[in-house]
Amino acid sequence: MNYFRVKIAYKGTHYFGWQAQSIDTLHEEKPTVEGTILNALKKITNYQPCTVSGASRTDGGVHARGQIAKITISQKISPEHLLLGLNSLLPTDIRILECVPSTKEYQASRGSVSKEYHYYFIASPVDNVATSDIALHLPIDSIGPDDLALLRSACRLFVGRHDFYNFSSRGSGTSFREIFYCDIHRANFSPLANDMFYLKIIGDGFLKYMIRYIMGALLELVRGRIVLDDISLYLQQHQEDKLSPRAKAKGLHLIRIEGPK
């Protein structure tokens, strides 16, 4: 068998998450990113044994610029030809960015040291049609200096090792995670939206819906519906009810996964 480590970017708008399911080959209206890559890989290998295993199981509608996956195929092929072959068969909203040889022992889904996500949102009375499927619309006039200071104060509460039971889907197993970095930035790189901001969060791992619940709490905070003490309480004690709705998937982007090569 031959093994490769690939870096993948995708726009998750039209996909039902990363993880392949049997429906990928049965119902094209419900594709997943992994399943779409696997179908392309089968064509390259003439339907010989092949597998794709990702490092992060992103939800439906979530995007990625730095997903990592391991590809296993029986056919001998160079990394360069595999990259070109996959990109020629994949839809334009999925791209293989890098492809390097790997080993049988390497497991993409294990051993990551950290993961970095960004959550993009636009604060304006009217949504921006150019970014409506990659950023959340927050229907307020603007985010001023005081709002930004408040959001950053809230972000600091999440840094460190905490029990994120209240900020995740119930039944996720152990709910302790360590956050290395959490802050709000203005997305100055975007000429399409001067009012775009993003949450940058880096941690040793994230529970299901964890970042979306954190972002949901930040949105409620800037709207004045909760206060900082509410966030502190929900980090300290298990609660019956959620502090906020979870933010929509479309603003979430997987940026980077650090781990063994």
UniProtKB/Swiss-Prot annotation:
InterPro entries documented for this protein: PsdUridine_synth_cat_dom_sf, PsdUridine_synth_TruA, PsdUridine_synth_TruA_a/b_dom, PsdUridine_synth_TruA_C, TruA/RsuA/RluB/E/F_N
UniProt entry tagged with the keyword Isomerase: yes
Source organism per UniProt: Desulfotalea psychrophila (strain LSv54 / DSM 12343)
UniProt-recorded name of the protein: tRNA pseudouridine synthase A 2
Family assignment from sequence similarity: Belongs to the tRNA pseudouridine synthase TruA family.
Enzyme class: isomerase
Record's subunit section: Homodimer.
Active site: D59
Gene Ontology MF terms in the entry: RNA binding; tRNA pseudouridine(38-40) synthase activity
PANTHER family to which the protein is assigned, alphabetical: PSEUDOURIDYLATE SYNTHASE, TRNA PSEUDOURIDINE SYNTHASE-LIKE 1
Function of the protein: Formation of pseudouridine at positions 38, 39 and 40 in the anticodon stem and loop of transfer RNAs.
Transport in keyword set: no
GO annotation, biological process: tRNA pseudouridine synthesis
Top-rank taxon, per record: Bacteria
